[in-house]
């Protein structure tokens, strides 16, 4: 039986930190679903369709990754995808409390859903999509933090 895991997030846009996490997840699970949340309340820079396309391009080299957009409750989405593992990235201790609350709620809603926390590699531990966008808005060089296709799309959005 295939072990299916979901790595959810807004991914606005997907960064090399996200790619690091999903790449390592593919080494642990047979199939990884990169689940891109619609998240309209976060007012994303990129549309859901754009974020899905950018993530598909950025993960094309990872054969066991499927990129899917969603707007459902995570536990319902996981159940519909026949996934029993939820992958979450932890950059700092500050992330842990919120992630623990989410994990407990998801476990309440779907008892068979296990949360697995991965720390990004050291070089990506301080970046976030929000930080990358903010630096780029002020003409800072964010080339190192994004896949090439995502960097081009971000620069086009900010032009």
From Swiss-Prot:
Residues reported to bind ATP: 10-11, 18, 89-91, 99, 124-130
E.C. numbers: 2.7.7.3
Residue numbers binding substrate: 10, 42, 74, 88
Function as written in the Swiss-Prot or TrEMBL entry: Reversibly transfers an adenylyl group from ATP to 4'-phosphopantetheine, yielding dephospho-CoA (dPCoA) and pyrophosphate.
Pfam family, any one: CTP_transf_like
Gene Ontology molecular function, alphabetical: ATP binding; pantetheine-phosphate adenylyltransferase activity
Places the protein is found: Cytoplasm
Naturally occurring in which organism (per UniProt): Escherichia coli O127:H6 (strain E2348/69 / EPEC)
InterPro entries (alphabetical): Cyt_trans-like, PPAT, Rossmann-like_a/b/a_fold
Quaternary structure and partners: Homohexamer.
A Gene Ontology term for the protein's cellular component: cytoplasm
Full protein name: Phosphopantetheine adenylyltransferase
Keywords from the named record: ATP-binding, Coenzyme A biosynthesis, Cytoplasm, Magnesium, Nucleotide-binding, Nucleotidyltransferase, Transferase
Entry similarity comment: Belongs to the bacterial CoaD family.
UniProt KW Nucleotide-binding keyword: yes
Site (Transition state stabilizer): 18
Reaction equations catalysed: (R)-4'-phosphopantetheine + ATP + H(+) = 3'-dephospho-CoA + diphosphate
Pathway listed: Cofactor biosynthesis; coenzyme A biosynthesis; CoA from (R)-pantothenate: step 4/5
Cofactor(s) demanded: Mg(2+)
Gene Ontology BP annotations: coenzyme A biosynthetic process
């Amino acid at each position: 039986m295939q072990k299916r895991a979901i790595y959810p997030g807004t991914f606005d846009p997907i960064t090399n930190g996200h790619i690091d996490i999903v790449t390592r997840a593919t080494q642990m699970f047979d199939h990884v679903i990169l689940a891109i949340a619609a998240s309209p309340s976060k007012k994303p820079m990129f549309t859901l369709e754009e974020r899905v396309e950018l993530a598909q391009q950025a993960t094309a080299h990872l054969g066991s990754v499927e990129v899917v957009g969603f707007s459902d409750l995570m536990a319902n989405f996981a159940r519909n995808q026949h996934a029993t593992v939820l992958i979450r990235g932890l950059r700092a201790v500050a992330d842990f409390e919120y992630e623990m609350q989410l994990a407990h709620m998801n476990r309440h809603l779907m008892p068979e859903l296990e949360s697995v926390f991965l720390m990004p590699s050291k070089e990506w531990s301080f970046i976030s999509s929000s930080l990358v966008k903010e630096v780029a808005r002020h003409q800072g060089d964010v080339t190192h933090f994004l896949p090439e296709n995502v960097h081009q799309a971000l620069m086009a959005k900010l032009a």
